[in-house]
Amino acid sequence: MMSSDRGESPAEVVLGFLEEAEPWRLRSAQFPSKVGGKPAWLSLRGLPCLPELECDRCRLPMAFLLQVYAPISGQDWSFHRSLLLFCCKTPECYTLNDSSCMKVFRSQLPRRNEFYPYDPPPEEEPLSDPESDQRVLPVSGVKLCWVCGCPGNKGCSRCHTVTYCGKNHQMLHWKHTHKKECGSQEVSLVTTSVFLFPETELVTEPEEEEDDGKEEDTKKDEGEEEGSTTKTDEDCLSLAETLAETDLEEMAMCETKDMKVFQRFKKRIAPEPHQVVRYSRGGSPLWVSSQHIPSDQDIPQCTCGAERTFEFQVVTAQ
């Protein structure tokens, strides 16, 4: 669980790591943080519709990447709270400094709600699993897409046993398995779709703070980098005759600044190189490059008019 207590220091960072887990531990009733598989929807009503889950560039359905369970203490309406990240699987949609192929959805519930018990879930595997049939959500009865686990009301016209979010996923399922199974009594209730990312649990632990010695080493390293840069500038004076002076200065400044940011990123993640999520509600991102860092004006306000704040970042490619 990612803690979202506003009383904590904004600088505190919680790291997320991948870990294998039993499938039942990644169900909605366990309030999981996880990567891949189908979404473990928190609220079982009011789910995003198909247009909201499409890539804004190619208009194809996006795939579920990960979700973070991050309740906010002290607020009953967000006693349960999950953030779900979806991404497009079309490589051509990923262009520099453009987030239109990724979307985040927030879902939250009070402690007393119609879907889950008031008390925390037990640590043992339940005797019965109401989520074992992944075609429909329990309680609400919302039908789900067989391929991606998102809301889907488009049924197979032949067997009427499976539903899809749209024609794209219906064709995908037909091509890979349903063509052989349609109308058969052997149609399985659970399937691993080729559309999904591998499913693993996202376990967390606080990031250890750097001690004074490490900070001094960092400053020393940065000083050495600056010294090296100065020496490099001296060595490259002979090239200044063939390159325009302004171009040379711009290149040097850009490369030096970008290298410092990248070195700072590498130093920060070096103690835990397998981290995949950095959570720090109200904190700051750990930038990998000095280029294309958004300004306050670049970050749109919430629909309520409030300023948006940083909450978490994904630091490795899945």
Where are these regions (language model features)?
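Preference for intrinsically disordered or flexible, low-complexity segments
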Residues: M1-Q318
